[in-house]
């Protein structure tokens, strides 16, 4: 890869290299960010990627979505056109684009003791509602949260189905005591999914940033919400699905595992989820069909939400970190069954 050729897309002089961030995820997902400084345009983030979801079409879509977010008052570093007037270029087989250098720090880099734990949270969730209430034109790709569709065409299933399948298979192959229960829950999940699909397809959609985490949330020096960065997982998404997936509280570590069957603890976590959905509801009014569909949707998605799924499998598989993790195998399945049968879920929506 010729870095000089890449750098000269944005200025006639070789820039000063400040730092390089490697965010690659395996040999099929190459992602590098070079923070450089040009004499003419100052600091710039040059991004180099080679994977199945970073394409010229998507980069153009990200640029338009970033402009839309900015027009709503949500700060996002813009994608810069190169010397040829294009948003991206292919150099030696790698896709290259550049963004303005970010004006704010990320939430992962702030002192939460000084600014207040997640002080930015309310405005962050309000921004989701603002985007939902003022939707950008749809794009022909999805976020990673998509249900019934695939984020990446190379994938076999959507994320939620993949999580449900992984849970079933692990129990069947490694914890035979609970294999029948796991298979029964998976079969019920599949039955409900199939029945719900036609209704789900009718729910309203919008285009979202698609990857809210502390490294992508921008905050002021006081810890207040400022905006977002990193739109490479953005896409068209069902509003109810996106709102819920970003709001559903997960477990942080094994010290919280006992709350899975603690009714009062679950109520507190539900209250946090409801509060986040309420903040989204400041700008976005959930429609009647969304409210009528929510209980059925929740019974399908919540039991196998990725945040819980990844923690559960780590608890069961990582014997070094969790030497007694498998003693929770039955509790995990009981929690999944509880989430699949809840009947008062619609009260979480504003």
Feature map (PLM): residue ranges:
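Juxta-kinase regulatory segment immediately upstream of eukaryotic protein kinase catalytic domains
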Residues: 1-20
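A glycine-centered beta->alpha junction motif in the catalytic cores
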Residues: 96-114, 169, 303-319
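Active-site acidic catalytic loop and adjacent metal/ATP-binding pocket
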Residues: 29-40, 45, 191-241
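Protein kinase glycine-rich loop
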Residues: 21-27
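Active-site activation/catalytic loop segments of kinase-like enzymes and analogous catalytic loops
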Residues: 240-285, 300-320
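Active-site catalytic-loop/activation-segment of kinase and kinase-like phosphoryl-transfer enzymes
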Residues: 144-197
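ATP/Mg2+ or Mg2+-diphosphate-binding catalytic cores
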Residues: 282, 302-350
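ATP-binding pocket architecture of kinase catalytic cores
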Residues: 39-142
